[in-house]
């Protein structure tokens, strides 16, 4: 007896293009630079931007703004949202994440023979004032230790 084979005809339809913007695209756009941030930093920043305040347990109609904290082992972000879920400001701190190549090269060119032993990446975002980014780097050369701040 021969096996019975079935075939299925699949219709293909062309769909119109849909562009979706996050409510907090300005926040993400202001953090964009020529050199991408370390992966854990980008992931947490995207989570902050995509946070849906109105469907969260924290949301109540009575409040004008909300402060929500986000944590990962490498860092944390404290974000302030308005009642519509738009990010007003953030304070961000990440420890020992990969430095951007330009920052790493600038440190090594300025301090030859020194090695980066620790780093802290600080970010402050404000919807009206923009963003400020600072790196605090600890350098070691044998028994000597040097702390450097870069912006």
Regions found by a protein language model. Give the residues of each.
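Sec-dependent signal peptide cleavage junction
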Residues: 5-58
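Long, charged/polar, surface-exposed segments that mediate recognition or autoinhibition
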Residues: 79-117
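Short coil turn/linker residues within repeat-based beta-strand modules
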Residues: 22-25, 83-86, 143-144
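Charged, amphipathic alpha-helical segments
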Residues: 51, 113-124
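Exposed beta-strand-loop-beta-strand "reactive/processing" segments of non-cytosolic proteins
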Residues: 38-79, 124, 128-148
């Amino acid at each position: 007896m021969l096996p019975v084979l079935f075939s299925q005809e699949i219709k293909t339809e062309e769909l119109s293009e849909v562009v979706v913007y996050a409510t907090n695209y300005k926040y993400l756009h202001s953090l964009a630079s020529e050199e991408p941030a370390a992966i854990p930093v980008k992931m947490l920043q995207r989570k902050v931007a995509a946070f849906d305040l109105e469907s969260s347990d924290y949301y109540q109609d009575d409040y004008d703004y909300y402060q929500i904290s986000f944590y990962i082992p490498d860092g944390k972000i404290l974000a302030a949202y308005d009642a519509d879920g738009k990010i007003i400001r953030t304070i961000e701190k990440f420890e020992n994440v990969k430095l951007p190549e330009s920052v790493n090269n600038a440190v090594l060119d300025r301090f030859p023979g020194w090695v980066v032993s620790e780093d802290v990446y600080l970010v402050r975002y404000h919807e009206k004032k923009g963003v400020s980014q600072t790196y605090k780097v600890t350098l070691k050369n044998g028994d000597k230790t040097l702390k450097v701040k870069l912006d």
